[in-house]
Amino acid sequence: CRKLFPWISLEGAKYLFVGTHLKANILEGNNLADITPIRLTTSAGDVTFAGKANTLSSGITATDTTIPLTSSTGFPASGTIQIGSETINYASVSGNNLIGATRGAESTTAATHSSSDAVLCATLTITDTSHGAVQNDFVTFSGASSLGGNITATVLNQEYQVANLINANSYTIKAKDTSNNTVFANSSDSGNGGSSVVGAYQLNTGLDVFVQADGWGVGTWGAGGFGSSTSLSFTNQLRLWSADNFGEDLILHARGG
């Protein structure tokens, strides 16, 4: 928690502002309400989705950390896949191989899989020109239609946290159902969500620890080459909140927000 601020309404209701590096919340009794400001709401059709699925080009054992695909085209640079009942996280893509696999993720059991077994991917690529998001930001989608398979409209039209940034125009999320269970795209998920998708981006998240503005080792792990320098901007500063009340109204502001 980065900031706590208590105040009382004119009717005597007691509130507590709870500001973290990710969210702005109000606590009333046992009820926590998300009041994080919206930074940007897109026009309909600005946001598109892409899901991927493929097959194994050869069999793998329960300990293999390289997953060979028939084709890796369109697979995110890192992500989460499912083969049979096993969930696997992978760290990178090389040729048609998923590299650095962590087997038996999400409490599943690592297993042997055969050539041509389906490889389903939960990591969706989102395209939105000049989205302005940073890693760990939150965005709520609405107006999306099914991609055609497991990635239904219900899966898409909810709040998501940005998993990884690809560039200024795209990023990835991990598909889930409304109970936060991972959902994996299948071969029928070939759509893009339709022309009515709207993305409501919340205020950029901040850092939870202080780092110097320039130097080495201050970026996200794995974000650049070893020993490369980086710098901070207003979108990745230490999150500091200012909060006060005007009567019963809460006034708040995030550093750099």
Set out the residue ranges of the language-model regions.
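Short beta-strand elements that form the blades of beta-propeller/WD-repeat-like
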Residues: G12-G19, E248-H253
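Small/polar beta-strand repeat architecture
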Residues: P37-D64, T70-L240
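Repeated scaffold domains used in trafficking and secretory/extracellular systems
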Residues: R2-S9, N236-S242
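Internal, well-ordered domain-core segments that constitute the primary functional module
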Residues: L240-G257
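Loop/turn residues immediately N-terminal
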Residues: H21-N25, I88, G256-G257
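Hydrophobic/aromatic beta-strand positions that recur at structurally equivalent sites within the blades
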Residues: W7, L27-G29, V93
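Beta-propeller domains
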Residues: Y15-L40
